């Protein structure tokens, strides 16, 4: 989990912006979206090969 310390004389907006940036870097929201619904390994492989095929063209 991203953790920041609010600096002296720092506004709440800038602290919130720093927190959002740190959480985006750590990938918390991406991991949450990925784990929201279970996906079978065979489906993952199929999606990965489809994405590779799309990139190729």
UniProtKB/Swiss-Prot annotation:
Residues 33-57 have a biased composition (Basic residues). The keyword Ribosomal protein applies. One of its GO terms (molecular function) is structural constituent of ribosome. Keywords: Ribonucleoprotein, Ribosomal protein. NCBIfam families: S21p. Belongs to the bacterial ribosomal protein bS21 family. This is Small ribosomal subunit protein bS21. It comes from Brevibacillus brevis (strain 47 / JCM 6285 / NBRC 100599). The gene is rpsU.
């Amino acid at each position: 989990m991203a953790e920041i310390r609010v600096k002296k004389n720092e506004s709440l907006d800038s602290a919130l912006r720093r927190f959002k940036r740190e959480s985006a870097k750590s990938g918390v929201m991406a991991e949450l979206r990925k784990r929201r619904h279970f996906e079978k390994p065979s489906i993952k492989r199929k999606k990965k090969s489809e994405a590779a095929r799309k990139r190729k063209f």
